[in-house]
Amino acid sequence: MQLNPAEISELIKSRIEGLGASSDIRNQGTVVSVTDGIVRVHGLSEVMAGEMLEFPATKDGQPTFGLALNLERDSVGAVILGEYEHISEGDTVKCTGRILEVPVGPELIGRVVNALGQPIDGKGPINAKMTDVIEKVAPGVIARKSVDQPVQTGLKSIDSMVPVGRGQRELIIGDRQTGKTAVAIDAIINQKGQNMTCVYVAIGQKASSIKNVVRSLEAAGAMSYTIVVAASASESAAMQYVSAYSGCTMGEYFRDRGEDALIIYDDLSKQAVAYRQVSLLLRRPPGREAYPGDVFYLHSRLLERAARVNADYVEKFTNGAVKGKTGSLTALPIIETQAGDVSAFVPTNVISITDGQIFLETNLFNAGIRPAINAGISVSRVGGAAQTKLVKGLSGGIRTDLAQYRELAAFAQFASDLDDATRKQLDRGARVTELLKQQQYQPLPISLMAATLYSVNKGFLDDVDVKKVLAFESGLHQFLKTSYAALLKKLEDSKALDKDSEAELAAAIGAFKKSFA
């Protein structure tokens, strides 16, 4: 049988035309080297900075993703998010065309997730309806609103001397074991009933420490409005570096919808160390203390996203669904110093970015003054405008009393005879110092805090023995709760002290003092 060339070509043409092959055009590359979680990939010509790259799946079928950080002439330097032991030279890498995203929304509340938003608390999957990119541009100047609403931490020393406002960035800084995390956890616990969603980001901590924090929050009933993002010390440096941005995106979801959120980064020193590790492995040139040149930008772009946004921004973002509401994201970053050295690279960076700082000192902590806040060098640059009238009116003298007391106490060690005015100041300072002590996980409502501040300001404690001051305070609180509940309710609602309330409060403290022995 002789085949006609024309027939053959027609047959081939018809076959080609009828071919229904599905094609997936994706940029692919090849792994050149894998070291310490850093992968060099050749052949990805259209990759974006910060894009997610898809690597071969693990043995149990879990997808493995990486983050493209270095775009060089011949290769791409990527960091693996998760396990990388199964990746070898010659493996195929695909571009996804997506920037790293994490799930966001109210479905995450009450859960413990990793840096990628995957649940790690054993309570089943999270059915979040939305995801959002972890790297976002902070709201512009026009979109912002000035800080004028308080975040009540429930800690006397903070709410009276270094108040925090909604949308503020207030740094908590101190050596290890000075109670930094305790201050942050107290602030979360005190948000119960304040319409505030909290995000706690644990970076580079021991898994046992994170477990203890979650247990404390559960015991206080705070997990019902809290998301915990955990990147423990056992996780890769990349996951620790990414976790802060993931937590920020989860908090921004609420800010952009006219709600209030509080985020705690515990702590940014470890995030900077993780980023330094990633940068050095990527062969980026080291600078001061071996940190890369953009370590300031690492923290500034994160903390600038904490802001109070105006009603127009919220309305525009929600396409008119939410009107007349401002949103806020308040940040309490934590920095750990080495032997009180606040002039190191990362501490000075973060101090310059934030709107104030709370210094915690080892000496005060060891002396039993907890929270160990140094009133002299702790400041809040914008929180004063947000402080409630009630606390603002009563806390004016506290800071001065403390500062003068610390100064005089140093001189008094050398002086044998002191005049009455100095002795009076020392006595007042000792009582104020004693009164600002507070048990962990026992934040105070604003009304009881006002009663405490009023009693010391008006001299009710001047003849009470210093060792009995805390007993006086707890007894007074119990007395007010049982006999003057209406007054406390009035103070909570009005957040101001009018003449009638002041007279009633003075009478109540006077009545209690007579019975106090």
From Swiss-Prot:
Q: Where does ATP bind?
A: 174-181
Q: Which gene encodes it?
A: atpA
On whether Cell inner membrane is a keyword of this UniProt record, the answer is yes
One GO CC annotation? proton-transporting ATP synthase complex
Q: What is this protein called?
A: ATP synthase subunit alpha
Broad enzyme group? translocase
Q: How does it assemble?
A: F-type ATPases have 2 components, CF(1) - the catalytic core - and CF(0) - the membrane proton channel. CF(1) has five subunits: alpha(3), beta(3), gamma(1), delta(1), epsilon(1). CF(0) has four main subunits: a(1), b(1), b'(1) and c(9-12).
Function of this protein?
A: Produces ATP from ADP in the presence of a proton gradient across the membrane. The alpha chain is a regulatory subunit.
Query: Which species does this protein come from?
Result: Methylibium petroleiphilum (strain ATCC BAA-1232 / LMG 22953 / PM1)
Looking up CDD domains in the UniProt record yields: ATP-synt_F1_alpha_C, ATP-synt_F1_alpha_N, F1-ATPase_alpha_CD
Keywords in alphabetical order, please.
ATP synthesis, ATP-binding, Cell inner membrane, Cell membrane, CF(1), Hydrogen ion transport, Ion transport, Membrane, Nucleotide-binding, Translocase, Transport
Enzymatic reactions: ATP + H2O + 4 H(+)(in) = ADP + phosphate + 5 H(+)(out)
What Enzyme Commission number(s) does the record list for this chain?
7.1.2.2
